[in-house]
């Protein structure tokens, strides 16, 4: 096997998806703790700023620049290298979160045992569906009272439309929590509260019949458990590796992240069964991870809010080959060879200069405004990775200037911020309005702040009568022109020059779709096929 094949086979690149407060940050810390990346959980700081008011958050971010460290964490576990990509939760949720999911090979879904499947989880699952991303599920907060585990599995199957295969099963819950049973190995892991946030290996009995177990959990509980397990194993699906890797089945684990309980069986199972880096589609051909030449795409750009250094870091997922420090690569969109100097790698909580990186790894490239989201880098081959979409925004505002003479700076600022993925920017065909689109409200605050700070533009964002947007395509140029003439009042151009239908209401969108059967209305737009226009 080649060096690239060996290294690729060791990589596990994934993201954690959850609704805010399901325990994602805590679980992230505990995975790093069990992975040996940190000695004491709590030293990886989540975006605690999300708990402050928005204004505090901006001031905080300004003081420290945005911390890049919370975005990618790499740690070794057994003989594997795990890359954990953070998906921002809370109010700073934006398209960023969706796009991180295009850069991973699998995902871990965290569900609060008391709340079950929540709205954000449903949205993130839809994004995973676009690429049939394999998903494991961790039902968290087992140390509190929650829903019946069988009902929870049923809820996941019904609401998210994915088959569940329980791998561990709880023995009690809340005050009565005694441990979990591993349904595949038969082992019983007893519950002991994690002390001082240090790694804690729980007491393990080899089976339900092991001597001493009945004394530990009580004979009555053991009898109830046997009955419940018979029911569960009769009614649920056994784990099927192929179905999991095809995104059709999710293995389910139970535990309590805050108490370090149930994390170890999850991590062991994850590194054994989660997929290594997979082949990826491009505009030209399918690129296999084990190919010798480097290729990768940018899925996120993180701006540094320090005005002294206008540097931005572009996060590139390596898809094939080997990256070595200082190597030259083709920036496909511009056609220029670029020296990838001082690229960063992220080891738990440190930024380090990357000496090398392999398929599945993520490196940070310094970017002075020339790199956009979706850009591909290769060792000379002209191809672009597909599957890095823009998502139709759900919130819209019109930008208005306090000083009309700053129009040029406003247009420049919006164009650059939309390239970076901070917002989307539309120009209606029939007016001079500048309309911004976002997935989360905080995106508007970030844009307003950065326009003022970086471009000297004081803009007000007003409500606008747009409810949703769809990119429009038609293979017949004559039909497209007809559609354009009839609907000019609702059409606009995005920052990449693509035609967009800006619908004032959902009903209006439905009618437009019915009246123009030859026109495709799309809720996502591929970066690979966008052609930038000024």
Curated annotation (Swiss-Prot):
Origin superkingdom: Bacteria
Entry-linked Pfam families: EF-G_D2 (PF22042), GTP_EFTU (PF00009), RF3_C (PF16658)
Principal location listed in the UniProt entry: cytoplasm
Keywords: Cytoplasm, GTP-binding, Nucleotide-binding, Protein biosynthesis
Alphabetical list of Gene3D superfamilies matching this protein: P-loop containing nucleotide triphosphate hydrolases, Peptide chain release factor 3, domain III
Protein's GO biological process: regulation of translational termination; translational termination
Subcellular location per the Swiss-Prot or TrEMBL entry: Cytoplasm
Keyword Signal in record: no
Domain called tr-type G: residue spans: 9-278
Keyword Repressor included in the entry's annotation: no
Binding-site list for GTP: 18-25, 86-90, 140-143
GO cellular component term of the entry, any: cytosol
Any one GO MF annotation of this record: translation release factor activity, codon nonspecific
Family: Belongs to the TRAFAC class translation factor GTPase superfamily. Classic translation factor GTPase family. PrfC subfamily.
Function summary: Increases the formation of ribosomal termination complexes and stimulates activities of RF-1 and RF-2. It binds guanine nucleotides and has strong preference for UGA stop codons. It may interact directly with the ribosome. The stimulation of RF-1 and RF-2 is significantly reduced by GTP and GDP, but not by GMP.
Protein name, as recorded: Peptide chain release factor 3
Species assigned in the record: Xanthomonas campestris pv. campestris (strain ATCC 33913 / DSM 3586 / NCPPB 528 / LMG 568 / P 25)
Gene: prfC
């Amino acid at each position: 096997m080649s060096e690239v094949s060996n290294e690729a086979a060791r990589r596990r690149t994934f993201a954690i998806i959850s609704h805010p407060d399901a325990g994602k940050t805590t679980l992230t810390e505990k995975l790093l703790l069990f992975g040996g990346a940190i000695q004491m959980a709590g030293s990886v700081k989540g975006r605690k700023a999300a708990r402050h008011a928005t204004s505090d958050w901006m001031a905080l971010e300004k003081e420290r620049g945005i911390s890049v460290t919370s975005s990618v964490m790499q740690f070794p576990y057994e003989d594997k290298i795990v890359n954990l990509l953070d998906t921002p939760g809370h109010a700073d949720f934006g398209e960023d979160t969706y796009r991180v999911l295009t850069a991973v090979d699998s995902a871990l879904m965290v569900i609060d045992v008391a709340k079950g499947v929540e709205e954000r989880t449903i949205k993130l699952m839809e994004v995973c569906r676009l690429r049939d991303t394999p998903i494991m599920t961790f039902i968290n907060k087992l140390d509190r009272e929650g829903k019946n585990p069988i009902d929870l599995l049923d809820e996941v199957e019904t609401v998210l439309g994915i088959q569940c295969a329980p791998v561990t099963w709880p023995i009690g819950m809340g005050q009565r929590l005694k441990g979990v049973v591993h349904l595949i190995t038969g082992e019983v892991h007893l519950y002991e509260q994690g002390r001082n946030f240090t790694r804690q290996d729980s007491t393990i009995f080899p089976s339900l019949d092991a001597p001493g177990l009945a004394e530990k959990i009580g004979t009555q509980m053991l009898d109830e458990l046997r009955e419940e397990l018979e029911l569960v194993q009769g009614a649920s699906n056994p784990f099927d590796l192929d179905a999991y890797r095809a995104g059709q089945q999710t293995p389910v684990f139970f535990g309590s992240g805050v108490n370090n309980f149930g994390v170890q069986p999850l991590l062991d199972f994850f590194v054994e069964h989660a997929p290594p880096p997979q082949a990826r589609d491009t505009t030209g051909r399918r690129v296999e991870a084990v190919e010798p030449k480097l290729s990768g795409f940018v899925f996120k750009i993180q701006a540094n809010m320090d005005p002294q250094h206008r540097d931005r870091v572009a996060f590139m997922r390596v898809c094939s080959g080997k990256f070595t420090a200082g190597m030259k690569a083709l920036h496909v969109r511009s056609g220029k060879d670029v020296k990838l100097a001082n690229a960063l790698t992220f080891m738990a909580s440190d930024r380090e200069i990357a000496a090398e990186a392999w398929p599945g790894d993520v490196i940070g490239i310094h970017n002075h405004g020339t790199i956009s989201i979706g850009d591909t880098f290769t060792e000379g081959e002209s191809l672009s990775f597909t599957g890095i979409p823009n998502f139709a925004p759900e919130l819209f505002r019109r930008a208005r200037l306090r000083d009309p003479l700053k129009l040029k700076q406003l247009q420049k600022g919006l164009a650059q911020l939309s390239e970076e993925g901070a917002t989307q920017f539309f120009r209606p065909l029939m007016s001079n309005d500048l309309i911004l689109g976002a997935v989360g409200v905080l995106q508007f605050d970030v844009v307003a702040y950065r326009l003022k700070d970086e471009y000297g533009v004081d803009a007000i964002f007003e409500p606008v009568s747009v409810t949703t947007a769809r990119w429009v395509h038609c293979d017949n140029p004559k039909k497209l022109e007809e559609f354009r003439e009839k609907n000019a009042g609702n059409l606009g151009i995005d920052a990449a020059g693509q035609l967009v239908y800006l619908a004032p209401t959902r009903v209006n969108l439905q009618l437009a779709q019915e009246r123009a059967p030859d026109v495709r209305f799309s809720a996502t737009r591929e970066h690979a096929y966008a052609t930038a226009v000024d």
